[in-house]
């Protein structure tokens, strides 16, 4: 009877080892996906960060990159701990899983909270940023972001093209008689912003605030879903690790 129980325990341990190994392979790929989403956000979707008053959007992306790197390292450690049957490595693996779990939950929560606050932030800050910093010394990033925003989303100003009447650049005389930036034009050529007729600029299409809000919210949903989704998967990894740790402990005795 004792021999049967021993074989049963050994069989259970082997099954847990292969289950955890399979999980770690999937976990490593998930880490790659998390890191890719973070890098994708920073590299391709961060053009408009200079227009945001808060750094939450940027912080969320960085958290995902860090979490993704740690996940990939942890996945390799998990495979080593599983096949070497080292309980000290399993403890370290569990702790790292817990840290990553918390990082991804934080990223998901930040994305959700910022998603709720974004409309208020843009209403309070976007117009001021555009009219006070556009083409001002030291704010080249803002100028580039505004031009790209207006061209990409076919809009002009924060709420509408009239916002540019308050622009420090327009009022300074440096605008060379322009009433709106050239990036407001449907066909962008040098000096086209001197004529603000609806046939020339994005006047009836409205301002950029709603379009920028929609753009950022879409990416916050992706960030939040990836963070929370991978965190939920990690719960299974922690359960498998605890089971294998307990199984090895029983075999030891």
Curated annotation (Swiss-Prot):
Under Gene Ontology molecular function, one entry of this record is: integrin binding
Q: Which InterPro entries match?
A: Tetraspanin/Peripherin, Tetraspanin_animals, Tetraspanin_CS, Tetraspanin_EC2_sf
Query: Tell me, what does this protein do in biology?
Result: Structural component of specialized membrane microdomains known as tetraspanin-enriched microdomains (TERMs), which act as platforms for receptor clustering and signaling. Plays a role in various cellular and molecular mechanism through its association with both integrin and non-integrin proteins. These interactions facilitate critical cellular functions, including cell-to-cell communication, wound healing, platelet aggregation, trafficking, cell motility, and angiogenesis.
Q: What is this protein called?
A: CD151 antigen
- Tell me the Pfam families matching this sequence: Tetraspanin
Provide the species name: Mus musculus (Mouse)
Q: Which CDD domains match?
A: CD151_like_LEL
Side Extracellular, residues: 40-57, 113-221
Q: What is the membrane topology noted in the UniProt record heading this document? A: Multi-pass membrane protein
User: Keywords assigned by UniProt?
Assistant: Cell membrane, Glycoprotein, Lipoprotein, Membrane, Palmitate, Transmembrane, Transmembrane helix, Ubl conjugation
Does Glycoprotein show up as a keyword for this record? Answer: yes
Listed under GO biological process in this entry are: cell migration; positive regulation of cell migration; positive regulation of endocytosis; T cell proliferation; wound healing, spreading of cells
Q: Where is a lipid covalently linked (S-palmitoyl cysteine)? A: 11, 15, 242-243
């Amino acid at each position: 009877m004792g021999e049967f129980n021993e074989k049963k325990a050994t069989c259970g341990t082997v099954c847990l080892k292969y289950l955890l190994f399979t999980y770690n392979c999937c976990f490593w790929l998930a880490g790659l996906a998390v890191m890719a989403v973070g890098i994708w956000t920073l590299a391709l979707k961060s053009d408009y960060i200079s227009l945001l008053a808060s750094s939450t959007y940027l912080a969320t992306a960085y958290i995902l990159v860090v979490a993704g790197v740690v996940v990939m390292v942890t996945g390799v450690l998990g495979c080593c701990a599983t096949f070497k049957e080292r309980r000290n490595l399993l403890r370290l693996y569990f702790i790292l899983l817990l840290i990553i779990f918390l990082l991804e939950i934080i990223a998901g929560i930040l994305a959700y909270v910022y998603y709720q606050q974004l409309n208020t932030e843009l209403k309070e800050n976007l117009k001021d940023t555009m009219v006070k910093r556009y083409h001002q010394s030291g704010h080249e990033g803002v100028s580039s972001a505004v031009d790209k925003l207006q061209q990409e989303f076919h809009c002009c100003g924060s709420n509408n093209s009239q916002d540019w009447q308050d622009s420090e650049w327009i009022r300074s005389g440096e605008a060379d008689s322009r009433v709106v930036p050239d990036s407001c034009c449907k066909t962008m050529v040098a000096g086209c912003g001197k004529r603000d007729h609806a046939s020339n600029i994005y006047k009836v299409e409205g301002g950029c605030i709603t379009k920028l809000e929609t753009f950022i919210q879409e990416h916050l949903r992706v960030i939040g879903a990836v963070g929370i989704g991978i965190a939920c998967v990690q719960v299974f990894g922690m359960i498998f690790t605890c089971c294998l740790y307990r199984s090895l402990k029983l075999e030891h005795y």
